[in-house]
């Protein structure tokens, strides 16, 4: 596991994907007096499909799922729902639909294309809405059938 992604492991994976999620959640909960919504972003890759060299990423994103399972029980009595959205390959600057990873994941896309950021945002918007008041502890996979 000592690979060229050493910088990623040391400066991004743990500080952003784990510590960042924990600290941001802790601070948000301090301000939620009358209930609220916590929505974390995981990754469908860590839920159902693993790739070579993705062990650290998988570890850090998978930590969110375990964290949320405990939060559901801790925060439910306070009227706070906790859910995770697990996007699949999404066309972003970091992972463009015409980038090098697309050749690997493209054939596995059931709908034949990468997701759009607005499609992931619509799932998050639903979870933030009053209509999702009974949804908590959910892992919602929005990956175009990538992990189907």
Task: Tell where the protein language model's regions lie, with residue ranges.
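Alpha-helical segment proximal to the catalytic Tyr-Lys
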Residues: 30-31, 73-74, 133
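Short, small/polar-rich loop/turn modules that mediate ligand/substrate recognition or access, typified
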Residues: 76, 81, 135-137
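Short C-terminal tail/terminal secondary-structure segment
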Residues: 48, 125, 136-148
């Amino acid at each position: 596991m000592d690979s060229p992604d050493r910088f990623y492991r040391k400066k991004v994976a743990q500080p952003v994907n784990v510590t960042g999620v924990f600290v941001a959640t802790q601070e948000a909960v301090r301000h939620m007096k009358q209930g609220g919504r916590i929505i974390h972003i995981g990754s469908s890759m860590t839920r159902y499909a693993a790739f070579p060299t993705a062990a650290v990423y998988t570890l850090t994103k998978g930590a969110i799922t375990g964290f949320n399972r405990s939060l559901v029980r801790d925060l439910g009595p306070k009227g706070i729902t906790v859910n995770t959205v697990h996007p699949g390959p999404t066309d972003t600057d970091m992972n463009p639909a015409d980038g090098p990873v697309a050749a690997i994941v493209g054939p596995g896309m059931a709908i034949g294309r990468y997701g759009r950021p607005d499609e992931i945002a619509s799932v998050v918007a639903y979870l933030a809405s009053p209509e999702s008041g009974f949804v908590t502890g959910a892992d919602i996979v929005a990956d175009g059938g990538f992990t189907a």
